[in-house]
Amino acid sequence: MLAVSLRDHGFPSATVQIRPAFCVQSDVVGSGNPPRMNYCQNARTAMSAALQSSDDAFRTVSSPLATDLDLSSPLEFFLRHRLTVVEELWEVVLRQECGQELVDILTQLRDLTSPEGQAPEVGGEALVQVIETLELSDAIRAARAFALYFQLINIVEQHYEQTQYQLAYERSRLEPLPGPDESPEGLHTIEIPQHQLDPFAAVIPLNQDPATFQTLFPRLRQLNVPPQMIQELTDRLDIRLVFTAHPTEIVRHTIRDKQRRIAYLLRQLDELETGKNRGFRELEAQNIRQQLTEEIRLWWRTDELHQFKPTVLDEVDYALHYFQEVLFEAIPLLYQRFRLALQGTFPDLQPPRYNFCQFGSWVGSDRDGNPSVTSAVTWQTACYQRSLVLDRYITAVEHLRNVLSLSMHWSEVLPELLSSLEQESMLFPETYEQLAVRYRQEPYRLKLSYILERLHNTRDRNTRLQQQQEKDPTTPLPEYRDGTLYQAGTAFLEDLKLIQHNLKQTGLSCYELEKLICQVEIFGFNLVHLDIRQESSRHSDAINEICEYLQILPQPYNELSEAERTAWLVQELKTRRPLVPARMPFSESTREIIETLRMVKQLQEEFGEAACQTYIISMSRELSDLLEVLLLAKEVGLYDPVTGKSSLQVIPLFETVEDLQNAPRVMTALFELPFYTQLNPTQSEPLQEVMLGYSDSNKDSGFLSSNWEIHKAQKALGTVARDHRVKLRIFHGRGGSVGRGGGPAYEAILAQPGRTTDGRIKITEQGEVLASKYALPELALYNLETITTAVIQSSLLGSGFDDIEPWNQIMEELAARSRRHYRALVYEQPDLVDFFNQVTPIEEISKLQISSRPARRKTGKRDLGSLRAIPWVFSWTQSRFLLPSWYGVGTALQEFLQERPEQNLNLLRYFYEKWPFFRMVISKVEMTLAKVDLQIAHHYVHELANPEDQERFERVFSQIAAEFQLTCHLVLTITNHGRLLDGDPELQRSVQLRNGTIVPLGFLQVALLKRLRQYRQQTETTGLMRSRYSKGELLRGALLTINGIAAGMRNTG
């Protein structure tokens, strides 16, 4: 036993005893048979042996912790201590609100799980019996309590992550910078022929990834990267993050506000407990603990769930909440840290432009499969965004007017500022009359007053635009004199820079002014750029209907071959002749397509092109899919064939494996159209954005195949773009879960083919992960900084491994084998659809009031093809299978290893150590496997399957369990880990922390789903209801368990 004193780390006198970790020795690969495991319990038990359930760990600080984490770290002890405090507060609140009886029920439920935090083996009746006999009210309270527990744990972990980042940032800032000749520790020279590598890939850091600016730039200097290359990359750096709504994000604003207040109180408590003279501040600490208790009690008495189906505008409000609360203030700090770190290492280099990192949004503009998103809704969204950002600017300028109180008695003023004041006195005579005397010697205050008038007028016009759309679009808007409002953020920026220039010329600077200029550069007057998205067949159907009405084709458009469609579309794109009559005698679907494009044109005229200039075509398959949108854009004036200019960027979204494979051919055909690359007059060199979808390709072919096809598509698209001298920006449609491309963004970006990044990237930020990334300022900064540093690294230090053809051939074989095995289960196993519908909560999820978007596409079918990727992944996650994120990987690896056991194992281990792409894939699979619990998954099968289906469903489950066992074994073998997640102790701790509580919550979900389905069967067959509970009560209980498991897993769909 190893004893560590807590007193050394600022905690009460106590000792933690650390047991040596129990390790599993993987059998040598080559026999073809993995060791026998009970659903990989050896691996899971080994991981759990390192970390006992949170209950035992937190009861007393003197209890032994079976962990090999670095408990010599004060920060780790700090986390343990804080978790203890929060769990104690949780129990206190439940005891106060519900009595000791509920606390006893929760304790009993958690105690009935295995010591490793796993579900007990099916057949152990104790836990099931307790759950089944619970009254519905007790079951709902238990579900709420567990959900609250997870939310509190998430807050503590976010707080811990933020503290980690702050400490790491301060440490890196204070450490002396190494000289250019000093060799960094942990660098290893890889002997690979130089022609296979990028110029600086010979030196690869094996530890301390430079995920912050303070670490990155010294590392680049150590590697002798030419400053000119860094400057060129910095000048073109273009990072875009696009917020999306999410069907599984069901946490209310009200709850988010409470979470933020609790995080603030925890930060105050930290300052008191870790500062000096703690004994004298104990009373203050007790007061904060009392406030925490009150906040948690208020939270307990608040509805976690929406009482109505959220509208699209509700989702807009939710997404923009993060800009209001965090991002608007955080983004200038990102620029400041970049500038200071760059110039601290390379003092002669210039920082990037302020808006190197920008934001977009699909919320309120993504109409793919969501009939609730109309042209009117998108217009309202744009007006709302504009209103929010104008409010922030008005507040900032009012503050600046107080700060810039410089008097002409004591400070010089340049003639150009005085000249602008004279002109504005004529534009705003009333303001001049009111303020000229008051500010006669304070020109900056007078200038800022005129700026405020313009901002107020701009906001007033925006409000009237929004009201006009809501009430009567024909109502005329009030007229404003030229120059009395801002048409765009550029004019506002010119006024601010005039003040900045005057201050600079007189030897002054103002941080608040610099910050506001940075914010205006980034957010403009639109806050975020709106992307329109629509499914490709909607455009084909619209053009088909238009052509049928006009009788201009010898046969229906949809019956033409691809070559015939393309030829006709190209011909139509050469003329201004309109196709669409003003009155539009078409179906609602076709009218909506045209009205959307007309609304985009109106938005651009009113708010500028940047407000909305991207049109994404989902399920893009052929060249005609892109030309159809361009033709419809021509009809509303977004493209002019005579000038050859377009204000709309047409973006293909390739989603399925087949479409990813065809993407290079489609883009080649597009770039070879003479008129196409000349569409955007603002670009010195044409820029094309291409979006790659992770969700549908994963659902189509499995995790390994999807990731490899996307990787290949990026390389091929990069080659096509370079051959045609077109700049390429890849738009990664990543979800929150691994099964939809989720996972750490830093590792994912480093795993991209380096030459395809080239300083440009666009990534979706899914609604379900927004809170984990942007709820706290330092977390938001860290997320943005890691993305930025990863883009710089990937662009400058590409590994070159992606170009080693024999490795690519091996990955091609692994992907094909994985795809075959995955599709054999998902699409060829005849019982899988029934299995999925019965043993996961998919039907209940589809009916829940948690999103404005339907769970299925409108095909009239209820097969897997019509099911969207999000509920597909969500359902597997809730039932603890997490199947889309790992199934098929084990078989692919095993078949490869059986060919040459020892040699191929060594090769895969080398891949894992050196190849960022392969390491990323295996790491994501390992993380997912650690979250799987097939014991409780089997409970879903046992309890929710119809009796007549039990036998065939058991066969399906056995097939899944065998693949899980195999995948666990081979991942551990390749990584040389004794337990899952040995390479990431913090994630390992986080997963284990939750396991003991997710298990009873899963059992509660099964019991509630069982009652809900029995209720439905009774009413459908007899028309009578024999349950004591209403359908609404049962559905509410089920939703609470979904909410709790989602919080516990920290990602869902």
From Swiss-Prot:
Broad EC category? lyase
Query: An example of a Gene Ontology BP annotation on this entry?
Result: oxaloacetate metabolic process
Q: Which GO terms describe its cellular component?
A: cytosol
SUPFAM superfamilies for the chain: Phosphoenolpyruvate/pyruvate domain
User: Carries keyword Protein biosynthesis?
Assistant: no
Could you tell me which cysteines form disulfide bridges?
A: none
> Catalytic center at which residues?
246, 699
* Gene3D superfamilies (UniProt xref): Phosphoenolpyruvate/pyruvate domain
EC number in record:
4.1.1.31
* Gene Ontology MF terms in the entry: magnesium ion binding; phosphoenolpyruvate carboxylase activity
The Basic and acidic residues compositionally biased stretches are 461-473
Q: Where is this region: Disordered?
A: 461-480
* Keywords on record: Carbon dioxide fixation, Lyase, Magnesium
Q: Which cofactor does it need?
A: Mg(2+)
Catalysed reactions, as listed in the record: oxaloacetate + phosphate = phosphoenolpyruvate + hydrogencarbonate
Pfam families linked: PEPcase
Record's family? Answer: Belongs to the PEPCase type 1 family.
Entry's NCBIfam families?
PRK00009.1
| PANTHER family, per database record | PHOSPHOENOLPYRUVATE CARBOXYLASE
| Annotated function | Forms oxaloacetate, a four-carbon dicarboxylic acid source for the tricarboxylic acid cycle.
**UniProt name for this protein:** Phosphoenolpyruvate carboxylase
This chain's source organism reads Synechococcus sp. (strain ATCC 27144 / PCC 6301 / SAUG 1402/1)
